[in-house]
Amino acid sequence: LNTPIQEGNNLYGVVTDPNGAPVGGIVVSDGFSCVATDANGVYQMPRHADAFHVFYRIPADREIPMSEGRPCFWQRLSKTQERYDFVLMPQQAVETDFKLVCIADPQVQKDTDLARFKEESVPDIRAHVSTLEGPVYGITLGDIIFNERSKDVTNQMMPPIALAMRESEIGLKLFQVMGNHDNCMTPTVTDESSNFDLAGRRNFEYKFGPCDYSFDRGNAHIVAMDDILLTDEKHNPSDYEGGFTDAQVEWLRQDLSLVPKDKLVIFCVHIPLRNATSFNRETVRNLLKEFDNVHI
């Protein structure tokens, strides 16, 4: 690396183009802090103890990277590795216009639900996308599956619904937002975090990546966040509040601090913010109010 790594920064790497040239100004995050790469393409930060991924904000002039038919702009963190590099593919031109298709609450719980989604919803979505001109992207707004107090279907339903949502099936690059029914009641993924709210979403993160992230398309800054706060240490998705932790608010503050105020901001969550003030919802709205044009 052409930039010295400061003491205490145990998460770092370099962002380059396909020719190995450094790319400066790229926002990189561990889900708790946001930093920008320097002129050498280097980022560095102290790794948060609960961090699960390192990821970058996809710039408007770069392609959306895909893996297994899904956007993949992250790397899962290991216990010992400190360096994680990224290669960004240039886009031919920054889009002046694009379409964003929002899909809410598939709530797949059993095989018949999955069959209906594949046989009815997917063809409808593909048909709609075919009528749209220009670039088209998609984002769910949570509750991809339907876990409830008496039935946890994470392992049964999340893999097949993820396959049904691949670009080759659904006809667009589809990002994800987490809903309350996407929380795993009894997490099967080993997680040493003492924060049970984080542990409840780990299986979702294994399949779809970070729950709090952002990306840019055209003149829009699109933010996706998990606004589900589990209140039951048994990870019961029926026991929750809508809102954000202090750590999430700080992540959002840092993310938005690196966005021009005249950019369009599209804020995607599962539970509508409405007029509620508790659990940091008013704080989040106040952060968004700093921008001229916001859609929630």
Range-by-range predicted roles:
Residues 3-10, 61-152:
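N-terminal active-site segment of His-dependent metallophosphoesterases
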Residues 97-110, 219-233, 266-268:
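Active-site-proximal beta-strand elements of phosphoester/diester hydrolases
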